[in-house]
Amino acid sequence: RQRQMCIRDRHIAGHPEGSKEIDPDGTTANVDQALSWKNEFSKRTDASMAITTQFCFDSNSVIEWANGIQKSGIDIPVHIGIAGPAKLQTLLRYSIECGVGASIKILQKRAKDITKLLLPYKPTQIISELAAYKSSNPDFNIEKVHFFPLGGIKQVSQFVKEI
């Protein structure tokens, strides 16, 4: 007897800061078109979907992107990607490898402050800013946080316990 497999939940990629690999010209045309197609797919099927984004460090970019996709009719819930606690060098390396644009500038600014170079990065600021925005805008489409354990699972787990 053959068993039928069923995928109930689908998570798709979101790119609040674009993707140079998908849109080498620096626009978000291909990323936007793909997200629109996936949104239409979710409407015409029984697909339960969520958008899980690349990791981000800048709440303004996230808020602008999330509001923009919502205004364009994309109603798939968003799980925002956040880099967990890690050394600055680790975050810069992953940011460059993954092409998280605007966020690299935030990390570079932090790298110039010698006192912050010695301390591990913690995503407290972006989490606080997004939580405050969600609190005053309940229809904001970010529903969950997805932590990328770039500094290790133990560090992320400890951070989550602290917040």
Question: At which residue positions do the language-model features occur?
Answer:
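Short, small-residue-biased leader/transition segments that mark boundaries at the very start
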Residues: R1-I7
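Active-site-adjacent beta->alpha loops and helix N-cap segments on the catalytic face
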Residues: Q4, F55-Q70, G152-V156
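Active-site mouth loops of central-metabolism enzymes
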Residues: H11-D32, K112-T124
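Active-site beta-loop-alpha junctions enriched in small/polar residues
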Residues: A13-S19, Q54-D58, G81-K87, F147-G152
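Active-site glycine-rich loop that binds ribose-phosphate moieties when present
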Residues: D23-T45, S61
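Conserved, mostly hydrophobic/aromatic
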Residues: K38, A47, I80, V145
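Short helix-capping segments at alpha-helix termini
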Residues: R44-D46, Q70-D75, N137-F140
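Catalytic-face loop-and-helix region of soluble metabolic enzyme cores
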Residues: I76-F140
